Design a protein with these regions (language model features):
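N-terminal helix-cap/turn-to-beta initiation motif at the start of protein domains
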Residues: 1-5
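Short, solvent-exposed loop/hinge segments that bridge or flank secondary-structure elements
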Residues: 7-49, 82-87
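A short, polar/proline- and glycine-enriched secondary-structure boundary/capping micro-motif
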Residues: 16-18, 54-60, 106-108
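Surface-exposed beta-strand edges and their flanking turn/coil or helix-capping segments
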Residues: 18-21, 90, 109-112
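Edge beta-strand at a domain terminus
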Residues: 27, 101-122
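Contiguous, well-ordered beta-strand patches that form the walls/edges
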Residues: 38-89, 118
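A short, solvent-exposed beta-edge/loop patch
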Residues: 81-103
Length: 122
């Protein structure tokens, strides 16, 4: 297993939040998190607010079989809920995307968010 410390490298993330019944462009706070690249190739991201303490992303290698892609991960959260992660082990860059609420939920509680950042191996 490999452990990384990750941080959004923008002034927060960009996306949309529902306000007054409509989604409007907004900025979200920057996130920092610990991420574990597991021996099985999947990725766990620490999240103390969850009962099990983490998000688990099920990962595959993009363009399977291409040697240039073997250290890249394209992942979907284990519940297939609209949370995605792409990660490059060589340069530590990631993109996280969440888009559950706009499609599946009528409440104002969930936004559509894209985060970009970098991770450093512990």
């Amino acid at each position: 297993e490999e452990v990384y410390y990750c941080s959004d490298n923008t002034n927060g993330a960009t996306g949309f939040k529902k306000k007054d019944g409509q989604y409007k462009q907004t900025n979200f706070y920057e996130k920092k998190f610990k991420m574990k690249l597991q021996d099985d190739g999947n990725i766990a991201i620490a999240e103390p607010r969850l009962s099990n303490g983490r998000w688990l992303y099920i990962c595959s290698t993009p363009y399977e079989g291409r040697q240039s892609m073997e250290k890249n991960k394209s992942c979907v959260e284990e519940d297939n809920n609209g949370y995605y992660l792409n990660f490059n082990q060589d340069n530590g860059r990631y993109v996280r995307f969440s888009g559950f609420g706009y499609v599946f939920d009528n409440s104002d509680s969930d936004g559509v968010i894209t985060r970009i950042g970098t991770c450093t191996k512990f």
